[in-house]
Every structure is written in structure tokens, then in C-alpha cells.
Amino acid sequence: MANKEELIEFEGVVTETLPNTMFRVRLENGHEVIAHISGKMRKHYIRILTGDNVKVEMTPYDLSKGRITYRAR
């Protein structure tokens, strides 16, 4: 399990909505990752749409997947 200090945080834009609350996100460095919504965002019913600016946390062990932790207004 990765510690909070080991997580890498990127900003990106949601390019596609996928089934099961998964999203394709284009990061600021040009890479595309598959990301899911964090638990607190699910709990508070925060909706994410295509084109939203988001923050994505990623573990250094798998840079193709991430967790969306924040949606910019």
C-alpha cells in the first residue's frame, strides 16, 4: 500500500467517460490514464463530466491508472 507521501499528483482534463465511474484523463504532460473517483467524491455525489479539470493521484508503481481527488470549478 502506498503512503500519502509516495503518491504523485497531476492535473488533467477528462476526455472520455467510461462505464463504472471510470474516466479517461489527459494529464498536463500529455499522457492519458484511466482514473476512478475517490470515495469522498462518491459519498458527496460530485459529478464529473467530459471537459472538467481534475486532480489525479497516481502511485509510482502503476502510471497507467489513477484516482480523481478534486474537480476544479
Curated annotation (Swiss-Prot):
<keyword id="KW-0963">Cytoplasm</keyword>
<dbReference type="GO" id="GO:0005829">
    <property type="term" value="C:cytosol"/>
</dbReference>
<keyword id="KW-0396">Initiation factor</keyword>
<keyword id="KW-0648">Protein biosynthesis</keyword>
<keyword id="KW-0694">RNA-binding</keyword>
<dbReference type="InterPro" id="IPR012340">
    <property type="entry name" value="NA-bd_OB-fold"/>
</dbReference>
<protein>
    <recommendedName>
        <fullName>Translation initiation factor IF-1</fullName>
    </recommendedName>
</protein>
<dbReference type="InterPro" id="IPR004368">
    <property type="entry name" value="TIF_IF1"/>
</dbReference>
<dbReference type="GO" id="GO:0019843">
    <property type="term" value="F:rRNA binding"/>
</dbReference>
<dbReference type="InterPro" id="IPR003029">
    <property type="entry name" value="S1_domain"/>
</dbReference>
<comment type="function">
    <text>One of the essential components for the initiation of protein synthesis. Stabilizes the binding of IF-2 and IF-3 on the 30S subunit to which N-formylmethionyl-tRNA(fMet) subsequently binds. Helps modulate mRNA selection, yielding the 30S pre-initiation complex (PIC). Upon addition of the 50S ribosomal subunit IF-1, IF-2 and IF-3 are released leaving the mature 70S translation initiation complex.</text>
</comment>
<comment type="subunit">
    <text>Component of the 30S ribosomal translation pre-initiation complex which assembles on the 30S ribosome in the order IF-2 and IF-3, IF-1 and N-formylmethionyl-tRNA(fMet); mRNA recruitment can occur at any time during PIC assembly.</text>
</comment>
<feature type="domain" description="S1-like">
    <location>
        <begin position="1"/>
        <end position="73"/>
    </location>
</feature>
<dbReference type="InterPro" id="IPR006196">
    <property type="entry name" value="RNA-binding_domain_S1_IF1"/>
</dbReference>
<dbReference type="GO" id="GO:0003743">
    <property type="term" value="F:translation initiation factor activity"/>
</dbReference>
<dbReference type="GO" id="GO:0043022">
    <property type="term" value="F:ribosome binding"/>
</dbReference>
<dbReference type="Pfam" id="PF01176">
    <property type="entry name" value="eIF-1a"/>
</dbReference>
<keyword id="KW-0699">rRNA-binding</keyword>
<comment type="similarity">
    <text>Belongs to the IF-1 family.</text>
</comment>
